[in-house]
Amino acid sequence: MKVFFILIIFSFTLATCQGECYGSVPLPIDGEDVPLRTCVDTHDGQKHLIVSTWKTANSFSCECTQIGLQCCQKYVAVA
């Protein structure tokens, strides 16, 4: 019975945690891959060089790589 209640509490905790990530990749033009030189931060519009990382004002940690931009929350919020 004790294990049952622990599993219920653990399941509730997992269900209320939220994590958010998003990213973007360069789109091909006329079927040709376009080499990525910079990434544009969607939060403030600033350009960032490839292989750079930065933190946004709204708690996202972003990284620009040759395959695109990826941003994730720096923490997990409880709903």
Swiss-Prot record:
Organism from which the protein derives: Protobothrops flavoviridis
Keywords attached to this entry: Disulfide bond, Secreted, Signal
Keyword flag Disulfide bond: yes
Record flagged with keyword Membrane: no
Main location: secreted
Subcellular localization: Secreted
Signal sequence, start to end: 1-19
Annotated Gene Ontology cellular component terms: extracellular region
Any Pfam family hit: PSP94
Job of this protein: Shows an slight inhibitory effect toward the metalloproteinase brevilysin H6, but does not inhibit the metalloproteinases thermolysin, HR1A and HR1B.
Matches recorded under InterPro entries: PSP94
Superkingdom, natural source: Eukaryota
Protein name per its UniProtKB record: Small serum protein 3
Disulfide bonds: 21-72, 39-64, 62-71
Membership in a protein family: Belongs to the beta-microseminoprotein family.
